[in-house]
Amino acid sequence: MNKKEHILIVGAGLCGSLLALRMAQRGFKITLVEKRPDLRKSDISAGRSINLAFSNRGIKGISLVGLTKKTEPLCIPMNGRMIHDKTGETFFSPYSGNKSEYINSISRTDLNALLLNEVEKLPNAEIIFQQDCKDVDLKSAKAVFEHFETKKKTELSGDILIGTDGAGSVVRQSMEADSDMNFRVSEYFLEHGYKELSIPAGKTEKYRIFKNALHIWPRGENMLIALPNLDGSFTVTLFMSYKKGEQNFEQLKSEKSIKAYFEEFYPDALEQMPDLIKDFSQNPTSPLGTVKCSPWNVQGKSLLMGDSAHAIVPFYGQGMNASFEDVVVFDEVLDDFEGNWQQIFDEYEKRRKKDTDAIGDLAIDNFHEMKEHTAAPVFQQKRKLETAFEQEFPDEFASKYRLVTFREQIGYNQAMQRGRAQDKAILKLLENNELSDSLGLKEKLEKVNQATKKMLDGTFS
């Protein structure tokens, strides 16, 4: 493989920027093309999530490019979920019994800007903004772009082309339109959408609610969440059905209806949201979708990566982390198979596909768990037990969440299989009152491990 080879990357979001940086560090010539303006110079959020959950799998990607120290000041640790009930009472549920394991809230814009700055420092990389991809020649790694303002068309090419252009990927649509490919794609959208709102920084206390947690207001069919920002504000997201159910976005059209809804379901949050009506009226309602597709490449010339290959809903906080892990896996495959792009692309998909399918499924599972079950007594009982196991026996037990979020050395698929079996085992044992207080914690763990093994073997009844 000639390190002078030219890689054309379509999409300069988080995945594309990290990929461009790593490939440039490896010596490839990089052209990174983005349809939006430079986010370092203008606000282009357009309803996209302002901050993101950043955890071990994503940190692995940042470590690969040597940016761990530069990323740390951008992070706010979140040690667990703070559950808010309708009366304003709270219940803190740690993410792990191990206090050194936590997730971070990080600004999408700050992290993306850091990556773009690092790409620009390298002489073998260039970034071109405001170029909207209109057409892709997948078999020759060429693409036609149209300037956002002038509408002038430009053709760019590389030795290979990688599409990191997000859930609505033009590169993926080109694969879907190619009748020679036998391309398969599924797009599944929830009946729910989301709307970004805010809790501003306080005047006396900087943070109006507890800083180091992901706040959740679970309300059955709908829910509110909040993540902290460095300036003391919180990014609040309302997840709600578009039209179905007793409460939905369609019903919340007037100032009166919006306020009445929040007074009934989120009274303690409403007290901290002076800009609710303005935010609700001005910010878009955005869809929540999962994309799965295959194959990810065309003849060793074009490849999909990140959300363009496997968009997921945000309920495991793994979208960015999964995309960053894509770059890590791709980098490992390059080490193993350098010299043949077809072999590299095929091997990359072989190693990655089952894991990205798994996190897509897990994210939908977690959506239902967060909005419906986090407030349920049996769920809280289960979490207390899991936390106790992790505190006392950290090497012998890991909850599903811990397997997915903090055990980055195992794949999402393995984490899902083990975690689902373990969840079913614990809930079944609790329902049958087989984990009574008369048992010691070690005995309870042995029962859980035995039941989990039977679940995995298909012999648990």
Which stretches of residues belong to each language-model region?
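Glycine-rich FAD pyrophosphate-binding loop
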Residues: 24-47
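Active-site-adjacent segment of FAD-dependent monooxygenases/related oxidoreductases
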Residues: 42-118
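C-terminal helical "tail/cap" subdomain of flavin- and related membrane-associated enzymes
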Residues: 332-461
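Conserved hydrophobic helix-helix packing surfaces used for dimerization/oligomerization
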Residues: 7-9, 30, 302
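Beta1/beta-strand and adjacent pyrophosphate-binding region of the FAD-binding site
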Residues: 2-13
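Conserved mid-domain beta->alpha element of the FAD-binding
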Residues: 12-25, 162-163, 197, 284-375, ...
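Conserved FAD-binding catalytic core of PHBH/FMO-like flavoproteins
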Residues: 117, 122, 131-135, 140-288, ...
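Conserved Rossmann-like nucleotide-cofactor binding loop
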Residues: 15, 38, 168
